[in-house]
Swiss-Prot record:
It is found in: Endoplasmic reticulum membrane. The keyword Iron does not apply. InterPro entries: Palmitoyltrfase_DHHC, PFA4/ZDH16/20/ERF2-like. Its EC number is 2.3.1.225. It is an enzyme of class 2 (transferase). Residues 158-208 form the DHHC domain. The chain crosses the membrane at residues 3-23, 79-99, 108-128, 202-222, 254-274. Residues 1-2, 100-107, 223-253 are lumenal. The lineage of its organism: Eukaryota, Fungi, Dikarya, Ascomycota, Taphrinomycotina. This is Palmitoyltransferase swf1.
Length: 356
Protein backbone atom coordinates (compact mmCIF):
# COMPACT_ATOMS: atom_id res chain seq x y z
CA UNK A 1 0.00 0.00 0.00
CA UNK A 2 1.20 3.52 -0.69
CA UNK A 3 1.26 6.27 1.94
CA UNK A 4 -2.31 7.42 1.23
CA UNK A 5 -3.76 3.96 1.89
CA UNK A 6 -1.71 3.60 5.07
CA UNK A 7 -2.82 7.04 6.21
CA UNK A 8 -6.48 6.20 5.59
CA UNK A 9 -6.14 2.90 7.45
CA UNK A 10 -4.52 4.70 10.39
CA UNK A 11 -7.33 7.28 10.54
CA UNK A 12 -9.98 4.54 10.37
CA UNK A 13 -8.34 2.51 13.16
CA UNK A 14 -7.89 5.60 15.34
CA UNK A 15 -11.54 6.57 14.82
CA UNK A 16 -12.70 3.07 15.72
CA UNK A 17 -10.61 3.19 18.89
CA UNK A 18 -12.09 6.56 19.85
CA UNK A 19 -15.61 5.18 19.26
CA UNK A 20 -14.91 2.14 21.45
CA UNK A 21 -13.40 4.21 24.26
CA UNK A 22 -16.14 6.88 24.12
CA UNK A 23 -19.20 4.67 23.79
CA UNK A 24 -18.09 1.35 25.28
CA UNK A 25 -19.16 2.31 28.81
CA UNK A 26 -22.60 3.56 27.81
CA UNK A 27 -25.17 1.32 29.59
CA UNK A 28 -26.91 0.44 26.31
CA UNK A 29 -23.62 -0.86 24.85
CA UNK A 30 -22.07 -2.30 28.02
CA UNK A 31 -22.88 -5.91 27.13
CA UNK A 32 -22.34 -5.62 23.37
CA UNK A 33 -19.18 -6.19 21.33
CA UNK A 34 -18.34 -2.48 21.76
CA UNK A 35 -18.61 -2.79 25.54
CA UNK A 36 -16.50 -5.95 25.60
CA UNK A 37 -13.81 -4.30 23.47
CA UNK A 38 -13.86 -1.30 25.79
CA UNK A 39 -13.22 -3.54 28.81
CA UNK A 40 -10.53 -5.40 26.86
CA UNK A 41 -8.62 -2.18 26.13
CA UNK A 42 -9.34 -0.47 29.46
CA UNK A 43 -9.12 -3.41 31.88
CA UNK A 44 -7.69 -6.61 30.40
CA UNK A 45 -4.68 -5.17 28.55
CA UNK A 46 -3.63 -2.83 31.42
CA UNK A 47 -3.88 -5.73 33.87
CA UNK A 48 -1.59 -8.00 31.83
CA UNK A 49 0.85 -5.15 31.18
CA UNK A 50 0.94 -4.52 34.93
CA UNK A 51 1.72 -8.20 35.56
CA UNK A 52 4.60 -8.11 33.05
CA UNK A 53 5.88 -4.82 34.45
CA UNK A 54 5.81 -6.17 38.01
CA UNK A 55 7.73 -9.24 36.93
CA UNK A 56 10.41 -7.61 34.78
CA UNK A 57 10.63 -3.92 35.79
CA UNK A 58 9.60 -3.91 39.48
CA UNK A 59 6.44 -1.96 38.60
CA UNK A 60 8.23 1.22 37.53
CA UNK A 61 6.36 1.51 34.22
CA UNK A 62 2.99 0.94 35.91
CA UNK A 63 3.71 3.68 38.44
CA UNK A 64 4.55 6.14 35.66
CA UNK A 65 1.44 5.17 33.67
CA UNK A 66 -0.76 5.49 36.77
CA UNK A 67 0.61 8.97 37.36
CA UNK A 68 -0.06 9.96 33.74
CA UNK A 69 -3.54 8.40 33.59
CA UNK A 70 -4.42 9.96 36.94
CA UNK A 71 -3.60 13.39 35.53
CA UNK A 72 -5.42 12.82 32.23
CA UNK A 73 -8.51 11.05 33.60
CA UNK A 74 -8.91 12.26 37.18
CA UNK A 75 -7.57 15.81 37.13
CA UNK A 76 -9.30 18.81 35.63
CA UNK A 77 -7.02 19.59 32.67
CA UNK A 78 -7.40 21.02 29.15
CA UNK A 79 -5.43 18.35 27.24
CA UNK A 80 -8.40 17.02 25.27
CA UNK A 81 -9.63 20.56 24.57
CA UNK A 82 -6.22 21.32 23.04
CA UNK A 83 -6.47 18.10 21.02
CA UNK A 84 -9.88 19.15 19.67
CA UNK A 85 -8.59 22.62 18.82
CA UNK A 86 -5.51 21.16 17.12
CA UNK A 87 -7.60 18.79 14.99
CA UNK A 88 -10.05 21.37 13.68
CA UNK A 89 -7.38 24.07 13.29
CA UNK A 90 -5.12 21.78 11.25
CA UNK A 91 -8.10 20.73 9.13
CA UNK A 92 -9.18 24.33 8.53
CA UNK A 93 -5.62 25.44 7.75
CA UNK A 94 -5.20 22.54 5.29
CA UNK A 95 -8.41 23.55 3.53
CA UNK A 96 -7.25 27.14 3.01
CA UNK A 97 -3.62 26.25 2.19
CA UNK A 98 -4.30 23.43 -0.28
CA UNK A 99 -7.76 24.44 -1.44
CA UNK A 100 -6.87 27.53 -3.46
CA UNK A 101 -8.54 25.98 -6.51
CA UNK A 102 -11.80 26.18 -4.53
CA UNK A 103 -11.38 29.44 -2.65
CA UNK A 104 -10.39 31.48 -5.72
CA UNK A 105 -13.86 30.78 -7.12
CA UNK A 106 -15.66 31.83 -3.91
CA UNK A 107 -18.29 34.54 -4.01
CA UNK A 108 -18.95 36.87 -1.07
CA UNK A 109 -21.74 34.52 0.06
CA UNK A 110 -19.35 31.57 -0.05
CA UNK A 111 -16.78 33.41 2.07
CA UNK A 112 -19.40 34.44 4.63
CA UNK A 113 -20.71 30.88 4.76
CA UNK A 114 -17.27 29.31 5.17
CA UNK A 115 -15.97 31.80 7.74
CA UNK A 116 -19.16 31.51 9.80
CA UNK A 117 -18.92 27.73 9.70
CA UNK A 118 -15.26 27.89 10.77
CA UNK A 119 -15.81 30.31 13.66
CA UNK A 120 -18.86 28.62 15.24
CA UNK A 121 -17.01 25.63 16.81
CA UNK A 122 -14.47 27.96 18.48
CA UNK A 123 -17.21 30.24 19.83
CA UNK A 124 -19.42 27.39 21.04
CA UNK A 125 -16.46 25.64 22.69
CA UNK A 126 -15.56 28.81 24.58
CA UNK A 127 -19.16 29.28 25.74
CA UNK A 128 -19.51 25.64 26.85
CA UNK A 129 -16.11 25.55 28.56
CA UNK A 130 -16.63 28.80 30.46
CA UNK A 131 -20.29 28.28 31.39
CA UNK A 132 -21.55 27.52 34.88
CA UNK A 133 -22.96 23.96 34.71
CA UNK A 134 -25.30 24.61 37.63
CA UNK A 135 -23.02 24.77 40.64
CA UNK A 136 -24.78 24.28 43.97
CA UNK A 137 -23.57 26.21 47.00
CA UNK A 138 -25.05 27.40 50.26
CA UNK A 139 -26.43 30.53 48.58
CA UNK A 140 -28.60 28.70 46.03
CA UNK A 141 -29.13 25.38 47.84
CA UNK A 142 -32.73 26.16 48.86
CA UNK A 143 -33.72 26.95 45.28
CA UNK A 144 -31.82 23.94 43.88
CA UNK A 145 -33.38 21.57 46.41
CA UNK A 146 -36.87 22.58 45.26
CA UNK A 147 -36.09 22.20 41.56
CA UNK A 148 -36.78 18.46 41.33
CA UNK A 149 -38.49 16.06 43.75
CA UNK A 150 -36.86 12.86 44.94
CA UNK A 151 -38.31 9.88 43.10
CA UNK A 152 -37.16 7.36 45.75
CA UNK A 153 -36.07 5.03 42.97
CA UNK A 154 -32.72 6.33 41.86
CA UNK A 155 -32.56 9.49 43.99
CA UNK A 156 -32.91 9.59 47.77
CA UNK A 157 -32.11 12.27 50.36
CA UNK A 158 -28.37 11.94 50.90
CA UNK A 159 -25.69 14.25 52.25
CA UNK A 160 -22.69 15.25 50.14
CA UNK A 161 -19.64 14.37 52.23
CA UNK A 162 -17.58 17.10 50.53
CA UNK A 163 -20.01 20.02 50.31
CA UNK A 164 -21.67 19.16 53.65
CA UNK A 165 -25.26 19.67 52.54
CA UNK A 166 -28.08 17.39 51.42
CA UNK A 167 -27.75 16.71 47.71
CA UNK A 168 -30.78 17.91 45.71
CA UNK A 169 -32.48 15.32 43.52
CA UNK A 170 -30.71 14.71 40.17
CA UNK A 171 -27.51 16.38 41.41
CA UNK A 172 -24.07 14.84 41.83
CA UNK A 173 -20.70 15.87 43.18
CA UNK A 174 -18.08 15.99 40.42
CA UNK A 175 -14.74 14.82 41.76
CA UNK A 176 -12.89 16.57 38.92
CA UNK A 177 -14.43 20.02 39.40
CA UNK A 178 -15.03 19.43 43.14
CA UNK A 179 -18.53 20.91 43.03
CA UNK A 180 -22.08 19.63 43.26
CA UNK A 181 -23.96 20.17 39.99
CA UNK A 182 -27.71 20.46 39.45
CA UNK A 183 -29.16 17.83 37.10
CA UNK A 184 -25.66 16.45 36.59
CA UNK A 185 -25.17 14.80 33.20
CA UNK A 186 -21.43 14.06 32.96
CA UNK A 187 -18.01 15.67 33.11
CA UNK A 188 -17.05 16.30 29.50
CA UNK A 189 -13.34 16.18 28.69
CA UNK A 190 -14.00 17.82 25.30
CA UNK A 191 -15.05 21.06 26.99
CA UNK A 192 -13.13 20.50 30.26
CA UNK A 193 -16.30 21.23 32.20
CA UNK A 194 -19.26 19.51 33.77
CA UNK A 195 -22.50 19.29 31.81
CA UNK A 196 -25.48 20.06 34.01
CA UNK A 197 -28.77 21.90 34.29
CA UNK A 198 -27.45 25.32 33.28
CA UNK A 199 -25.12 24.44 30.38
CA UNK A 200 -26.48 21.26 28.76
CA UNK A 201 -27.88 23.57 26.06
CA UNK A 202 -24.37 24.93 25.41
CA UNK A 203 -23.00 21.39 25.19
CA UNK A 204 -25.64 20.61 22.54
CA UNK A 205 -24.71 23.85 20.76
CA UNK A 206 -21.05 22.78 20.79
CA UNK A 207 -21.93 19.41 19.23
CA UNK A 208 -24.18 21.02 16.62
CA UNK A 209 -21.53 23.58 15.68
CA UNK A 210 -18.93 20.83 15.36
CA UNK A 211 -21.14 18.65 13.17
CA UNK A 212 -22.09 21.59 10.92
CA UNK A 213 -18.39 22.30 10.31
CA UNK A 214 -17.79 18.65 9.41
CA UNK A 215 -20.85 18.57 7.12
CA UNK A 216 -19.78 21.82 5.48
CA UNK A 217 -16.36 20.32 4.80
CA UNK A 218 -17.87 17.09 3.45
CA UNK A 219 -20.30 18.89 1.13
CA UNK A 220 -17.84 21.43 -0.28
CA UNK A 221 -14.99 18.97 -0.76
CA UNK A 222 -17.37 16.27 -1.95
CA UNK A 223 -18.69 18.58 -4.66
CA UNK A 224 -15.10 19.46 -5.58
CA UNK A 225 -13.96 15.83 -5.86
CA UNK A 226 -17.10 14.84 -7.73
CA UNK A 227 -16.15 17.39 -10.41
CA UNK A 228 -12.64 15.87 -10.62
CA UNK A 229 -13.86 12.33 -11.27
CA UNK A 230 -12.66 10.84 -14.56
CA UNK A 231 -15.40 8.41 -15.59
CA UNK A 232 -13.64 7.57 -18.87
CA UNK A 233 -10.49 6.31 -17.18
CA UNK A 234 -12.27 4.91 -14.11
CA UNK A 235 -15.81 3.87 -15.07
CA UNK A 236 -16.48 2.44 -11.61
CA UNK A 237 -18.21 5.02 -9.38
CA UNK A 238 -16.15 4.18 -6.27
CA UNK A 239 -12.83 3.94 -8.13
CA UNK A 240 -13.40 7.28 -9.86
CA UNK A 241 -14.13 8.86 -6.49
CA UNK A 242 -11.11 7.22 -4.88
CA UNK A 243 -8.68 8.41 -7.52
CA UNK A 244 -10.19 11.91 -7.48
CA UNK A 245 -9.53 12.05 -3.73
CA UNK A 246 -6.00 10.69 -4.21
CA UNK A 247 -5.25 13.30 -6.86
CA UNK A 248 -5.31 15.98 -4.14
CA UNK A 249 -4.08 14.07 -1.12
CA UNK A 250 -4.08 16.93 1.39
CA UNK A 251 -7.68 17.93 0.67
CA UNK A 252 -8.56 14.25 0.38
CA UNK A 253 -7.28 13.71 3.91
CA UNK A 254 -9.42 16.58 5.21
CA UNK A 255 -12.45 15.13 3.40
CA UNK A 256 -11.96 11.59 4.75
CA UNK A 257 -11.20 12.73 8.31
CA UNK A 258 -14.31 14.94 8.23
CA UNK A 259 -16.35 11.98 6.99
CA UNK A 260 -15.12 9.66 9.75
CA UNK A 261 -15.31 12.25 12.54
CA UNK A 262 -18.84 13.20 11.51
CA UNK A 263 -19.95 9.63 12.25
CA UNK A 264 -18.45 9.84 15.76
CA UNK A 265 -20.02 13.22 16.50
CA UNK A 266 -23.38 12.11 15.06
CA UNK A 267 -23.35 9.05 17.32
CA UNK A 268 -22.67 11.23 20.35
CA UNK A 269 -25.31 13.76 19.32
CA UNK A 270 -27.80 10.97 18.63
CA UNK A 271 -27.16 9.47 22.07
CA UNK A 272 -27.70 12.85 23.73
CA UNK A 273 -31.01 13.26 21.88
CA UNK A 274 -31.99 9.75 22.97
CA UNK A 275 -31.37 10.76 26.59
CA UNK A 276 -33.63 13.79 26.11
CA UNK A 277 -36.29 11.51 24.60
CA UNK A 278 -35.96 9.04 27.50
CA UNK A 279 -36.10 11.77 30.12
CA UNK A 280 -32.84 11.14 31.93
CA UNK A 281 -29.22 12.23 31.95
CA UNK A 282 -26.04 10.25 31.29
CA UNK A 283 -25.53 9.92 35.04
CA UNK A 284 -29.12 8.76 35.50
CA UNK A 285 -28.86 6.28 32.63
CA UNK A 286 -26.26 4.39 34.66
CA UNK A 287 -28.59 4.32 37.66
CA UNK A 288 -31.50 3.11 35.51
CA UNK A 289 -29.21 0.46 34.04
CA UNK A 290 -28.38 -0.81 37.54
CA UNK A 291 -32.08 -0.87 38.38
CA UNK A 292 -32.84 -2.76 35.16
CA UNK A 293 -30.26 -5.38 36.19
CA UNK A 294 -32.07 -5.87 39.51
CA UNK A 295 -35.43 -6.11 37.71
CA UNK A 296 -34.00 -8.74 35.38
CA UNK A 297 -32.95 -10.77 38.44
CA UNK A 298 -36.47 -10.41 39.91
CA UNK A 299 -35.32 -8.51 42.97
CA UNK A 300 -37.49 -5.37 42.71
CA UNK A 301 -41.04 -4.91 44.01
CA UNK A 302 -43.31 -1.91 43.69
CA UNK A 303 -46.04 -0.48 45.90
CA UNK A 304 -47.98 2.77 46.15
CA UNK A 305 -48.05 5.26 48.98
CA UNK A 306 -50.10 8.47 48.86
CA UNK A 307 -50.52 7.98 45.11
CA UNK A 308 -46.77 7.74 44.46
CA UNK A 309 -45.05 4.65 43.12
CA UNK A 310 -42.24 3.38 45.35
CA UNK A 311 -39.81 0.49 44.99
CA UNK A 312 -38.35 -2.01 47.41
CA UNK A 313 -35.85 -4.83 47.15
CA UNK A 314 -37.15 -8.35 47.64
CA UNK A 315 -35.80 -8.60 51.20
CA UNK A 316 -37.59 -5.37 52.23
CA UNK A 317 -40.83 -5.79 50.26
CA UNK A 318 -44.14 -6.03 52.09
CA UNK A 319 -46.65 -8.79 51.39
CA UNK A 320 -48.84 -6.54 49.23
CA UNK A 321 -45.93 -5.35 47.04
CA UNK A 322 -45.97 -6.39 43.37
CA UNK A 323 -42.99 -8.01 41.66
CA UNK A 324 -41.59 -5.81 38.87
CA UNK A 325 -40.97 -7.91 35.76
CA UNK A 326 -40.36 -5.11 33.25
CA UNK A 327 -38.86 -1.64 33.35
CA UNK A 328 -41.99 -0.39 31.59
CA UNK A 329 -43.82 -0.86 34.91
CA UNK A 330 -41.61 1.73 36.60
CA UNK A 331 -42.58 5.39 36.29
CA UNK A 332 -39.91 7.98 35.54
CA UNK A 333 -41.27 11.15 37.11
CA UNK A 334 -38.60 13.23 35.36
CA UNK A 335 -39.78 12.23 31.87
CA UNK A 336 -42.36 14.72 30.58
CA UNK A 337 -42.25 13.75 26.91
CA UNK A 338 -39.66 14.69 24.32
CA UNK A 339 -40.98 18.19 23.65
CA UNK A 340 -41.11 19.20 27.32
CA UNK A 341 -37.79 17.49 28.05
CA UNK A 342 -36.12 19.41 25.23
CA UNK A 343 -37.84 22.66 26.23
CA UNK A 344 -36.51 22.31 29.79
CA UNK A 345 -33.03 21.65 28.38
CA UNK A 346 -33.08 24.86 26.32
CA UNK A 347 -34.82 26.89 29.05
CA UNK A 348 -33.62 25.09 32.19
CA UNK A 349 -35.10 27.41 34.80
CA UNK A 350 -38.63 27.31 33.42
CA UNK A 351 -38.96 23.99 35.19
CA UNK A 352 -42.07 21.86 35.40
CA UNK A 353 -41.75 21.01 39.08
CA UNK A 354 -42.81 22.94 42.14
CA UNK A 355 -41.79 20.93 45.19
CA UNK A 356 -41.97 22.18 48.72
Amino acid sequence: MDFFYKYLALVAIASLMVFILLFGQIPKLKYTVIGKLNRFFMVTIPYHLHVLDSRYADGRCSAAMRSLSNYVLYKNNPLVVFLYLALITIGIASFFIYGSSLTQKFSIIDWISVLTSVLLPYISLYIAAKSNPGKIDLKNWNEASRRFPYDYKIFFPNKCSTCKFEKPARSKHCRLCNICVEKFDHHCIWINNCVGLNNARYFFLFLLCTIQLLFHSILRLGYHFNALRDMRQYPSFLRSWWFAIKSEGELGSVFLISLICSVLVLCLLGYEFFLVYAGYTTNESEKWSDLAHLVKNRKVYMYYENGSQLLALDKDASNDAILVTSMSQIDNIYDNGFYNNFFSLVFPYRHLYSTT
